[in-house]
Amino acid sequence: MVERRQAKPTVDFIDEYCEYYRNLFSDVRGFEAFKFLHMGMISDIKRKTLPAISKVVGLDNHQPLHHFLTVSPWDTKLLKKHRLQLILNILAGRPIILIIDETGDKKKGKSTDYVKRQYIGNLGKTDNGIVAVTAYAVFCGMTFPLTFEIYKPRERLKEGDKYLTKP
């Protein structure tokens, strides 16, 4: 029997954090891509694009990261649920302050999913953009994200999407 290859190490604290999620990935390449994306997101590169992240983490090209995000067999809902359970375990019933934030990003063009001319709160005006509602927790002076939902304008719904008004 061939022993499974170990994932390439990154930085100790990223390796330790990502280890909590290892069982969500069916192969070592997917788990490595998960770790590399974490490395890229905390790096000091200006734009967090897949080509830029692949360079900063030492990959020859961005294809492994692109594959991980587009066709890899991991479940985003399961990952979110697992992450929230980890947070609940760490909090151990201690109270948090809950913050709900509606944030918009201006977007050029209309090819990005759910982009529409709509009110963008942080710009203070109506513009072409995408809006997300995010829930954060504050605990002992630390702020961390809990979950988010992209607002889906009725005109831009895909098959199977459900329309909900903005909160």
Locate predicted features.
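Conserved, well-structured functional cores that handle cations and Mg-NTP chemistry
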Residues: 1-167
